[in-house]
Amino acid sequence: MFSGIVETTARVLRMDHPHGSTNVDITLTVPFWDELAIDQSVAHNGVCLTVVSIHPEEKSYTVTAVQETLQRSNLGDLRPGDRVNVERSMRSDGRLDGHIVQGHVDTTAECIGLEDVGGSTYYTFRYSVTDEMAARGYTTVEKGSVCINGVSLTVVDSERDTFKVAIIPYTKEITNFGDLSEGKRVNLEFDIIGKYLAKLITFRQ
């Protein structure tokens, strides 16, 4: 489990396709590389991935993304040099400063607008939503929580297939929101509490 409080960004060094496999091995460098361990869970742009190898000589580590993950997230869009938001899994005695994040991306959204207002940046996103998705809780709620590229954020405006969030300068600096521009895709994980409530309502109908 994660909290959506990004620790830092990792830099993609290379994307390798193992022979005969549809998986992709992603090698990244990050300041706390020497604190990582094989089999450890780390969220990358909100996607929970397992550390499969560590490379002390280049201060890097490798994770593997399967085809399902590549299709459902924006990890397949990554190129060497790109920055990725990273967060290690929560400790049992840690604080939940964001909201409950599973690291299971639901879908992607497209950034369709940026506006600087009073020192903060407002980002508008659009995503495809069907009646079935909405009934399963795959939606946003004004003043509710949503996880975007692994960042726990509060929705400031919500419509059926669009929503808006506000990013303060600090968050923009320590995450890859500073690299985000119109037309780029981001990963979305909707609030798990909302999804459970939607499921409960469906059962009762």
Segment roles from a protein language model:
Residues 1-205:
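Conserved loop->alpha-helix
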